[in-house]
Regions:
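An acidic-aromatic substrate-binding cleft motif
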Residues: 70-94, 100-102
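Internal alpha/beta domain cores that form substrate/cofactor-binding pockets in large enzymes
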Residues: 376-380, 386-458
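Flexible, acidic/histidine-containing loops and adjacent segments that form or flank the divalent-metal
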Residues: 2-7, 32-48, 52-58, 66-72, ...
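Active-site metal-binding motif and surrounding structural segment of the metallo-beta-lactamase
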Residues: 91-96, 105-168, 377-396, 408-413
Length: 550
């Protein structure tokens, strides 16, 4: 391979050790531990089949057949504190952010971890002011819950970032004003009253187009609602940004369609054509209260790259899972009703004194319910089955076991937060995820659990380092030196977000690794805990095989 200092290169091995010297040995020669897909720069020097490179901030040596020009798919689940946050880099080097956590939150005291991660990842603090802003192709706000969208507000305001499109589920909270007494009005917009046949409300004011969004923002220029404030920040600081409504009728997200190596199917939210007052609109059903409706209509993506399938599904709840399964299976019986009836029949069979005929009839009814539930699961699985899935609603317990069975993943990633009142991930949900997964040893990752084991040891070192830097700053004799140390402190805080809690997926469409940082690195060449998914040709699906050290 002819190397060029102006080209981008990427690790093509599962993992490799960056050497300090061009030698095979790693003992006392390890500079860093690199993963499949890590970006590197060639520094212009070779020594036999070794090349000097810079990767993950360190200079060192790698064999030239350990890297290539092929960029992989990278999916990072960020430890953003409370909420969800996913960072994707496509094989075409486009950046997609799906949710960003709660950022600074209601109090303004939150960690704003997605902001810090993006600042660290793209070195924004050191980016030349004369350079054009760094492009983020897509920001996706899966639904208007603070712990999913408010982390975007400071990113939207960042002068060194440019957001091209912002996608959403069409639900925009707005002030009620003087219309709050009318049942026809709702702070998610107007709702269509049910007809005798429908028996359900639909949201009439779903924001469907860019112009719809601009009109809503213009109608409420001074609203203090956090969602509107976040959207205004996007518009005011990114003049060319386009707001895009996402629903299942589009089939694919943006240009990631069947003509692209990376495909992103849109499975939700689901709209229905509703006629009201002589107009017909594609509307979202009112699933329950406002929270259930907002969460249940989360944007759902199914990513396909090569052989790998990844499901990303916002904050789906039991009511929405029933509705989704009805839509995709074509069977109107609810999963939740069947689950309840099966449980009740089983209890009756155990606890009641039944005649032979009564028992036979009850067992027959149980068999019929099980067969129908299995059919719904099978039909839904045809659409939703994935190899890796982001858990719905941070590992909350408001999920259907049967819907989890329809997803049937090998690995589940739970993005969970710090608020003890939520207690996410819930123990019963963890058990349900494992039980509904495929394989003998299904994998469950949690951004919080990945961090919690080091939160009492690592921070002591981290804060001591900050304290030492603060002392140096106080002792500095010039403002320039003080500013330099302050920037170093901010960069340290930014990089800390990526060190612990993040779960990363790397794949070329055939090989797949899922990795997280070790609690305590064993050496500079052993920093990552890595899990491999292997393609089984006979089964035509991925499987996990336990490796060394697991």
């Amino acid at each position: 391979m002819s190397l060029d200092t102006n080209k981008a290169y990427f690790i093509n091995q599962r993992d490799v050790v960056l050497r300090m010297q061009p030698l095979e040995k790693t003992s006392k020669n390890a500079a860093n531990h690199l993963l499949l897909g890590d970006y590197l720069r060639y520094l212009g020097t070779t020594d036999g089949d070794w090349a000097k490179v810079k990767c993950r901030g360190d200079e060192g040596w790698l064999k030239t057949d350990w890297f290539s020009e092929q960029r992989l798919l990278e999916i990072n689940f960020i430890d953003i504190g409370q909420g969800d946050g996913c960072h994707i880099v496509t094989p075409d080097d486009e950046v997609i952010l799906i949710d960003a956590g709660e950022g600074e939150g209601f109090t303004g005291q939150g960690g704003d971890n997605m902001y810090r991660f993006i600042t660290w990842r793209y070195n924004l603090r050191c980016r030349d002011d004369g350079k054009p802003p760094f492009d983020i192709e897509h920001a996706v706000m899966t639904h208007p819950d603070l712990d999913h969208y408010y982390g975007f507000i400071n990113l939207f305001k960042h002068p060194k970032l440019n957001f091209k499109t912002i996608s959403h589920n069409g639900i925009v909270e707005r002030p009620l004003g003087g219309a709050s007494q009318s049942s026809f009005l709702y702070d998610l917009g107007r709702k269509v009253p049910p007809t005798p046949r429908q028996k359900v409300y639909h949201l009439w004011d779903t924001v469907r187009t860019h112009q719809d969004m601009i009109e809503v923002l213009d109608a409420h220029p001074n609203s203090q609602k956090f969602y509107l404030s976040t959207l205004r920040a996007a518009r005011d600081n990114n003049p060319q940004v386009q707001f895009k409504f996402v629903d299942q009728s589009q089939k694919f997200f943006a240009a990631y369609n069947q003509n692209n190596d990376l495909q992103m199917e849109v499975l939700g939210p689901i709209t229905e054509d509703i006629e009201f007052n002589g107009q017909t609109k594609d509307c979202l059903i009112k699933l329950g209260n406002e929270g259930e409706t907002k969460n249940g209509h989360s944007v759902i993506f199914k990513l396909r790259y090569g052989k790998l399938k990844v499901l990303l599904g916002g904050d789906l709840n039991a009511k929405s899972q029933d509705y989704i399964a009805q839509y995709y299976s074509g069977i109107q019986t609810k999963m939740s009703d069947l689950e309840d009836e099966i449980r009740d029949i089983r209890e009756d069979l155990i606890s009641q004194n039944l005649t032979i005929d009564e028992r036979k009839a009850m067992e027959q009814r149980l068999d019929e319910h099980r067969k129908l539930l299995d059919l719904i699961i099978s039909k839904t699985r045809g659409v939703f089955q994935a190899d890796i899935a982001k858990a719905c609603h941070h590992g909350a317990s408001d999920v259907l076991d049967s819907f989890l069975q329809a997803i049937n993943p090998i690995a589940t990633v739970i993005s969970s937060g710090d608020e003890e009142s939520h207690s996410h991930p819930r123990p019963d949900a963890l058990g349900a995820f494992g039980k509904a997964s495929r394989g003998h040893r299904p994998l469950i990752f949690s951004t919080e659990l990945a961090r919690s084991s080091v939160e009492f040891s690592y921070p002591i070192k981290f804060y001591q380092k900050l304290k030492d830097m603060e002392a140096k700053k106080d002792a500095a004799t010039t403002q320039a030196k003080k500013d330099e140390i302050q920037q170093d402190m901010e960069q340290l805080r930014d990089s800390n977000v990526a060190k612990y809690g993040m779960i990363t997926i790397r794949t070329d469409g055939e090989r797949v690794i899922i990795a997280q940082k070790l609690e305590e690195e064993r050496s500079p060449g052993q920093k990552w805990d890595i899990y491999d998914l292997f393609w089984n040709d006979k089964l035509q699906e991925y499987e996990y095989r336990k490796g060394k050290g697991h």
